[in-house]
Amino acid sequence: MKSFVTSWADEVDADYVDGLPPSNEYIKGDYKYVTEYKFNDDGKKVKVVRTFKIEKQIVPKAVARRRNWVKFGDSRSDKPGPNSQTTMASEEILMQFIGSKEFDQTHETQLDPGKNIAKCRICNGEHWSVNCPYKGTSMDSKTVMETKANAAAAAAISDPSKTGKYVPPFMKDGGGISGSKNWGRGRDRDDSSAVRISNLSESMTETDLEELVKKIGPHTKMYLAREKNSGLCKGFAYVHFKFRQDAAAAIEVLNGHGYDHLILCVEWSKPQP
């Protein structure tokens, strides 16, 4: 009596008793079909059919050369492409390649030396607030602003003639007197907003003096007295502020302030003949 094979598993067992049949593949249109055989967890033979869609892509030359590498070791006899038994196909990861010009522009923008990211909130200097030398002292920007407001109010009370309105030159002090002693060199000099800073160290420079007074208010000029021979500071300087209230604020803030291991003495400059 002739026996009939009723399933593909029986056909496989009849032809390959001691092992699994080899996998096979064929291409039909834009699809590739791969048939494989393996044992499942229960020890039974199963047939797996994979379907792949063929797509043509333009890849870099380095990728094309890498795909033509000759396989070695146990995969020497494998066909081109990944082997499902030794390679696990993961999700595709897309990478964005930035050109050298774009990288240089981004790098220069981040490291632009002209843009200083550090700004002190105490004295508005080009350093971090934790490193500010005036932190916790009377030179705090908040204290300076309050002092300037108080000094401006006091200056307005002490000098009621300064109401902010325009005053013609001939109505100012000495404006209508011809041949006055104010005519000449001393006529253009106004010492009402000048202060004298004394008890300065010998190593004091114009740059240090500029850093000391610039946060209080704008000034028109300043003079640092120096020795003729050595060039060292004599210990005092004059600063002419643009506004009288700023000069009053400088006296209130800097007078008695410690600077370079010395206590500063700041007062109104006496009128010079």
From Swiss-Prot:
Q: Which Pfam families match?
A: eIF3g (PF12353), RRM_1 (PF00076)
Q: Which family does it belong to?
A: Belongs to the eIF-3 subunit G family.
* Protein's job: RNA-binding component of the eukaryotic translation initiation factor 3 (eIF-3) complex, which is involved in protein synthesis of a specialized repertoire of mRNAs and, together with other initiation factors, stimulates binding of mRNA and methionyl-tRNAi to the 40S ribosome. The eIF-3 complex specifically targets and initiates translation of a subset of mRNAs involved in cell proliferation. This subunit can bind 18S rRNA.
Cell compartment(s), UniProt: Cytoplasm
**Which InterPro entries does the entry mention?**
eIF3_g, eIF3g_N, eIF3G_RRM, Nucleotide-bd_a/b_plait_sf, RBD_domain_sf, RRM_dom
Describe the subunit structure.
Component of the eukaryotic translation initiation factor 3 (eIF-3) complex. The eIF-3 complex interacts with pix.
Q: What is the lineage of its organism?
A: Eukaryota, Metazoa, Ecdysozoa, Arthropoda, Hexapoda
Listed A to Z, the keywords are: Cytoplasm, Initiation factor, Protein biosynthesis, RNA-binding
Q: Which PANTHER family match?
A: EUKARYOTIC TRANSLATION INITIATION FACTOR 3 SUBUNIT G
Q: Which domain of life is it from?
A: Eukaryota
HAMAP family named in the record: eIF3g
Q: Name one GO molecular function term.
A: translation initiation factor activity
Q: Which gene encodes it?
A: eIF3g2
Per the record, its GO cellular-component terms are: eukaryotic 43S preinitiation complex; eukaryotic 48S preinitiation complex; eukaryotic translation initiation factor 3 complex
Sequence ranges assigned to domain RRM in this UniProt record: 193-271
- Which SMART domains does the record associate with it? RRM (SM00360)
Record-linked Gene3D superfamilies: 3.30.70.330
Protein name, please? Eukaryotic translation initiation factor 3 subunit G-2
- What main location does UniProt list? cytoplasm
Mention one GO biological process in which this protein takes part, according to its record: formation of cytoplasmic translation initiation complex
